[in-house]
Amino acid sequence: NWRDIFQNWEALAHAYPSFIEGMIFRFLNASTFDGYNPYRVTKDGFDWEIIEAHDPWSYIGYWGDHQIIYLLKFLEFIQKHYPGKLKDSLTENHFVYAHVPYIIKSYQDIVKDPKDTIVFDEELHNQIDRQKEDLGADGALLKTPKGDVYHVNMLEKLLATVLAKMSNFVP
């Protein structure tokens, strides 16, 4: 899970500071177009939770709040050890979006029940699984209408995260 990743990666970054840029890229590339993170990052990409009929404890949901703190710590670390290292990444399209089969409900629905905010899209889940069989981990990345992996810059990735928190705030 994300906490374990951060605790391990933070120690690794202190031992091997040159790894930090790759860690930041991996972290950001696991976020979705709507600014959230799936369940966990793995060596094969990332996973998301699904509802399992036989498991009453199964649950779906995005992760996001504590990942923002972890990302901030990584950004502070790279700035301390390699000042300006990520400057070009702000404008160069080196990043991708995770494609997770969750649909965020409308604001009106979220206000009605702020504890039930997403819908699992089983058809999209199956489509992504088929793409993963054909393309490997890239099958779970957001694509353009032509089927190419959609690339963005770091500024967009960071703004998506900020906007997700601001626009999905329920008073």
Question: Where is each model-derived feature located?
Answer:
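Acidic, mature catalytic/reactive cores of soluble proteins
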Residues: N1-P171
